[in-house]
């Protein structure tokens, strides 16, 4: 199978961290401090939303996530985004997901509230499995194309009668 991991950001409250732990999937956390993180494999991004609510979308995407995604290598490996939020904030609920989805041109795969429910966990696990399988199939097709290009095709031998 092609490698796929979860990359996520969680503040010191650890709400997103606890959700990711429930998934039981390979994961890498974007540091809260300014330490850089570079990934070299495909990933799903799980990100909380930090918006004030109403029409105030400023600051919806955490600065650490912006810094992480400013790295072109990190951007190219993102296969989709999942966001969390608080429905008390109305229109800005889980807004970080749609913002990142639009900027990176990747699918918004799921949105959940706060720590997520057991149903959210199952949905994200299913999304991960489906995407991992899809990524594996695409990698297999790419490998076949590469194999076809790098290995010359031998012409069949002609049989001649004596």
Curated annotation (Swiss-Prot):
GO terms for biological process: protein modification process. SUPFAM superfamilies: Flavoproteins. GO terms for molecular function: FMN binding. It holds the Pfam family Flavodoxin_NdrI. Gene3D superfamilies: 3.40.50.360. Belongs to the NrdI family. Probably involved in ribonucleotide reductase function. This is Protein NrdI. It comes from Streptococcus pyogenes serotype M5 (strain Manfredo).
């Amino acid at each position: 199978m092609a490698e796929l991991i979860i990359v996520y950001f969680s503040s010191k409250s650890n709400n997103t961290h606890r959700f990711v732990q429930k998934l039981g999937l390979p994961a890498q956390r974007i540091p809260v401090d300014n330490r850089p993180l570079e990934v070299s494999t495909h990933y799903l991004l799980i990100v909380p939303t930090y918006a004030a609510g109403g029409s105030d979308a400023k600051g919806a995407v955490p600065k650490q996530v912006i810094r992480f995604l400013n790295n072109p290598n990190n951007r190219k490996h993102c296969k989709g985004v999942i966001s969390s939020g608080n429905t008390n904030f109305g229109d800005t609920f889980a807004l970080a997901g749609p913002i990142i989805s639009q900027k990176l041109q990747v699918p918004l795969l799921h949105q959940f509230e706060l720590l997520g429910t057991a149903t959210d966990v199952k949905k994200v696990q299913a999304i991960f499995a489906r995407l991992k399988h899809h990524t594996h199939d695409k990698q297999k097709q790419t490998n076949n194309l590469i194999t076809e290009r790098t290995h010359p095709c031998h012409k069949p031998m002609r049989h001649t009668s004596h």
